[in-house]
Swiss-Prot record:
Alphabetical UniProt keywords: Cytoplasm, Gluconeogenesis, Glycolysis, Isomerase
GO MF: carbohydrate derivative binding; glucose-6-phosphate isomerase activity; monosaccharide binding
Gene: pgi1
Organism expressing this protein natively: Neisseria meningitidis serogroup B (strain ATCC BAA-335 / MC58)
Pathway in which this enzyme or protein is active: Carbohydrate biosynthesis; gluconeogenesis; Carbohydrate degradation; glycolysis; D-glyceraldehyde 3-phosphate and glycerone phosphate from D-glucose: step 2/4
Gene3D superfamilies given in the database record: 1.10.1390.10, Glucose-6-phosphate isomerase like protein, domain 1
Principal location class: cytoplasm
Primary enzyme class: isomerase
The protein's name in its UniProt record: Glucose-6-phosphate isomerase 1
E.C. number(s) listed in UniProt: 5.3.1.9
Family of this protein: Belongs to the GPI family.
Length: 548
């Protein structure tokens, strides 16, 4: 395979970095009136302004060269054609098939997967219609008012993020709840708000053996039966998203209410599949299909557009520029919309679980940085929390500022204030404030020269801080589908360039294996096992505390 450090463009970019690292965006804008127009893209309802980055035409040309040398176009083709690019698990990677609205065949192991995809989608729609219309009744013949999704990781973060983001499109009768943490308090809090007669539980676990999910599911089942008293009532209040029909049936769920997905759907890419059942229940089939349409639009742009005008590719390459050349170890997601407050955590899992890898596809140490730490918060809150570090800290931290052009509320003046802050932050990160500008400002306030010189270093902003401004014309299912697909493809492209597998997650396994051993010790089912002295001390502390 091709190793990044052996690619000619990798070395060319280092030479270019040495020549260009002192360039300031402020001067680049002053010298180039067409800069914003040139570094500007629109795809469907999304607009990307990437002009406020430490790039010029040579930077982008070399990055596109790097992408081609790394085999990005070929790898993209392989994914869309169902080839098994997840090599460590010998699986295809076909979340794009879940939103393939053309229904053109996508073949895996000689079988077109589209009939299966459409069959499950149709069953989801029928089920959602019954619940939303009120024809699905609980064991006391009451309509469903609350839906509790029990899952973890991709079975939780995607549906939770999308239901929260699109709350204005949700069914007014349905209250959505999500349980992922096995600590007990999250489930207890949810159960205290719902009534067994009107609650539908969705258990989302591919194998139906995930410890955290099954623990919560069994507790919810026990709570339900304590009220209902009849095991046959379980079938009216529990549905499953799984492939383990036997375990689902043993739980008491009618397998007619089990919705399957496939091993070529990774958890963090699964909200488009049956894992998205809570989304369809809340938003309805039509809006769910619109979400798929938006994702498909981005898929078609991604696979059919030259790299030079390809939105996910450009975002990926700019990220490579900062991570691997500037040493930018983190990336901020800052949505300026309260309903998008779950988006940073979703992107965090998507990016860090996909690309937090230390070896290449052929098992060699990568020898360079891979996934940055992804973090963030709604933009306005971030301005009064961590933006200080972004403006005047010592880190190079690229920021995605995400906003909607259309108002989401009828409250006068709010949206204009919001967008003024978005645009102002992007300009401030780019321009900064020079010492002379600070002096002039303080002098105009009547401050004496000595005090001015004391304050100048503190009030100076270096600027040259990179941002991507991502605007939706409105927050709706279609644009949210496009936005998430954009980030999926960005993540994929970066993984290709780094030479890693973006679709496995072996890093989650070791802790789970060790937890099984320790659990036996904590419950008394096994005697003491061999651990390091710290772990043994922690186990003993727990046992001593709970003997009291």
């Amino acid at each position: 395979m091709k190793h990044l450090h052996d690619l000619p463009a990798w070395s060319k970019l280092w030479n270019h970095f040495d020549d260009s690292k002192t360039l300031h965006m402020r001067e680049m804008f002053e010298q180039d009136p067409q800069r914003a127009e040139r570094y500007w893209l629109q795809v469907g309802g999304l607009t990307l302004d990437y002009s406020k980055n430490r790039i010029n035409d040579e930077t982008m040309s070399l990055l596109f060269e790097l992408a081609r040398e790394a085999g990005v176009p070929e790898r993209m083709r392989q994914m869309f054609h169902g080839e098994k690019i997840n090599t460590t698990e010998n699986r295809a990677v076909l979340h794009v098939a879940l939103r393939n609205r053309t229904n053109s065949p996508i073949v895996v192991d000689g079988e077109d997967v589209m009939p299966k995809v459409n069959r499950v989608l149709q069953r989801m729609g029928e089920f959602a219609h019954e619940v939303r219309s009120g024809s699905w009744l609980g064991y006391t013949n009451q309509v469903i008012t609350d839906v509790v999704n029990i899952g973890i990781g991709g079975s939780d973060l995607g549906p939770l993020m999308m239901c929260t983001a699109l709350k204005p499109f949700g069914h007014p009768r349905l209250n959505m709840h999500f349980v992922s943490n096995v600590d007990g308090s999250q489930l207890r809090d949810v159960l205290s708000k719902v009534h067994p007669e009107t609650t539908l539980f969705i258990i989302a676990s591919k194998t139906f053996t995930t410890q955290e999910t099954l623990t919560n599911a069994l507790t919810a089942r026990e709570w339900f039966l304590n009220h209902a008293g009849d095991e046959e009532a379980v079938a009216k209040h529990f549905a499953a998203v799984s492939t383990n029909q036997k375990a689902v049936a043993e739980f008491g769920i009618d397998t007619a209410n089990m919705f399957e997905f496939w091993d070529w759907v990774g958890g963090r890419y699964s909200l488009w599949s049956a894992i998205g059942l809570p989304i369809m229940l809340y938003l309805g089939e039509e809006n769910f299909i619109e979400m798929l349409n938006g994702a498909h639009l981005m898929d078609q742009h991604f696979i059919n557009t030259p790299l030079e005008r390809n939105l996910p590719v450009i975002l990926a390459l700019i990220g490579i520029w900062y991570i691997n050349y500037y040493g930018g170890g983190s990336h901020v997601i800052a949505p300026y919309d309260q309903h998008l407050h779950r988006l940073p955590k979703f992107i965090q899992q998507l990016d860090m679980e996909s690309n937090g890898k230390q070896v290449t596809l052929d098992g060699k140490a990568v020898g360079h940085e891979t996934s940055p730490i992804i973090w963030g918060e709604t933009g306005i809150n971030g301005q009064h929390a961590f933006f200080q570090l972004l403006h005047q800290g010592t880190h190079i931290t690229p920021i995605d500022l995400i906003a909607s052009l259309e108002k989401r509320s009828n409250l006068p003046g709010h949206h204009e204030i919001l967008l003024a802050n978005v645009f102002a932050q992007a300009e401030a990160f780019m321009r900064g404030k020079t010492p002379d500008e600070v002096r002039a400002e303080l002098k105009a306030q009547g401050m004496d020269e000595v005090r001015i010189e004391e304050l100048v270093p503190h009030k100076t902003f270096s600027g040259n801080r990179p941002t991507n401004l991502i605007l939706m014309d409105k927050v709706n299912p279609r644009n949210m589908g496009s936005l998430i697909a954009m980030y999926e493809h960005k993540t994929f492209v970066q993984g290709i360039i780094w030479g890693i597998n973006s679709f496995d997650q072996w890093g989650v396994e070791l802790g789970k294996q060790l937890a099984k051993t320790i659990l036996g010790e904590l419950t008394g089912e096994t005697g003491p096992q061999k651990h390091d002295s710290s772990t043994e001390r922690l186990i003993n502390l727990y046992l001593q505390t709970n003997r009291k």
